[in-house]
Amino acid sequence: MSLLRSLRFFPVACTGRSARAVLLQPSQPWHTLHAGPSLSSSASSKELLMKLRRTTGYSFVNCKKALETCGGDLKQAEAWLHKQAQKEGWSKAAKLHGRKTKEGLIGLLQEENTAVLVEVNCETDFVSRNVKFQQLVQQVALGTMAHCQNLTDQLSTYSKGFLNSSELSELAAGPDGEGSLKDQLALAIGTLGENMSLKRAAWVKVPSGFYVGSYVHGEMQSPSLQNLVLGKYGALVICQTPEQITNLEEVGRRLGQHVVGMAPLSVGSLDDEPGGETETRMLPQPYLLDPSITLGQYVQPQGVTVVDFVRFECGEGEQVAEAE
């Protein structure tokens, strides 16, 4: 089924407003261990081993090696495990560098008056469905959200910004993460064994009188990620709303759905003449859910003014490069 057809016939997904970080925990990032002094077989040593395993998610053999190396000190053992995983991740990332990453996920996160879209890529759709890859997307979304919320500009109108791959890499990881996002990326590569990339992010922040509508298509549900929404397409639509509107969330979702399905290049004007299926201005385009009217004709009686939008399609840059 085509994207347009599926958008017209399937219900619109609801999005959440907040998310909590879930730390990316590699399960078994390295395999060869050298012999070392053995741990005591006492009950306390076994308890330490179990606790370290639960806390970090690493294998028993690696947790045992960490405790032996660090003389049974739990905090030092945890730090040692993360350091070893980091080394393995960077080593594997260097080996896999250059392999194409045309799969992946779009992540949408909204909190109060702020919304972010991020794109993280991998080599295969199979890995994109792995919860550890999805936790990486969450870390990127949370890091972008923190970056946006730390901006202290006093808003009289909306604010919109973009981050490229190198800018994303330098951001701090989410609240429960360690180091930068590029460190989290290396851990994920070491764990899952595929090349990955932090492709891009967009953020929108609005004052009173504005609203950010959103939509993600091809949504994937993952309870551990709470209100982060994942999919293959995503859109943010910035609307001005001078009055209180009861169905504003529904209108915002429908506008986001239209942006995903019709891929406009600009907003246009309510005065623009309709241009049919080839129209690239948003407002004079045929409305996705009712092509007998334009989007502008749908929006006008709703009491909102569309002022801007952002649209992400997973892997679109890679697809264009391959076509060329």
Swiss-Prot record:
<dbReference type="InterPro" id="IPR014039">
    <property type="entry name" value="Transl_elong_EFTs/EF1B_dimer"/>
</dbReference>
<keyword id="KW-0496">Mitochondrion</keyword>
<dbReference type="Pfam" id="PF00889">
    <property type="entry name" value="EF_TS"/>
</dbReference>
<dbReference type="GO" id="GO:0005739">
    <property type="term" value="C:mitochondrion"/>
</dbReference>
<comment type="function">
    <text>Associates with the EF-Tu.GDP complex and induces the exchange of GDP to GTP. It remains bound to the aminoacyl-tRNA.EF-Tu.GTP complex up to the GTP hydrolysis stage on the ribosome.</text>
</comment>
<keyword id="KW-0597">Phosphoprotein</keyword>
<dbReference type="GO" id="GO:0003746">
    <property type="term" value="F:translation elongation factor activity"/>
</dbReference>
<dbReference type="GO" id="GO:0070125">
    <property type="term" value="P:mitochondrial translational elongation"/>
</dbReference>
<feature type="modified residue" description="N6-succinyllysine">
    <location>
        <position position="132"/>
    </location>
</feature>
<protein>
    <recommendedName>
        <fullName>Elongation factor Ts, mitochondrial</fullName>
    </recommendedName>
</protein>
<keyword id="KW-0648">Protein biosynthesis</keyword>
<keyword id="KW-0809">Transit peptide</keyword>
<comment type="similarity">
    <text>Belongs to the EF-Ts family.</text>
</comment>
<feature type="transit peptide" description="Mitochondrion">
    <location>
        <begin position="1"/>
        <end position="44"/>
    </location>
</feature>
<dbReference type="InterPro" id="IPR018101">
    <property type="entry name" value="Transl_elong_Ts_CS"/>
</dbReference>
<feature type="modified residue" description="N6-succinyllysine">
    <location>
        <position position="75"/>
    </location>
</feature>
<feature type="modified residue" description="Phosphoserine">
    <location>
        <position position="269"/>
    </location>
</feature>
<dbReference type="GO" id="GO:0070129">
    <property type="term" value="P:regulation of mitochondrial translation"/>
</dbReference>
<keyword id="KW-0251">Elongation factor</keyword>
<dbReference type="InterPro" id="IPR009060">
    <property type="entry name" value="UBA-like_sf"/>
</dbReference>
<dbReference type="InterPro" id="IPR036402">
    <property type="entry name" value="EF-Ts_dimer_sf"/>
</dbReference>
<dbReference type="InterPro" id="IPR001816">
    <property type="entry name" value="Transl_elong_EFTs/EF1B"/>
</dbReference>
<dbReference type="Pfam" id="PF25025">
    <property type="entry name" value="EF-Ts_N"/>
</dbReference>
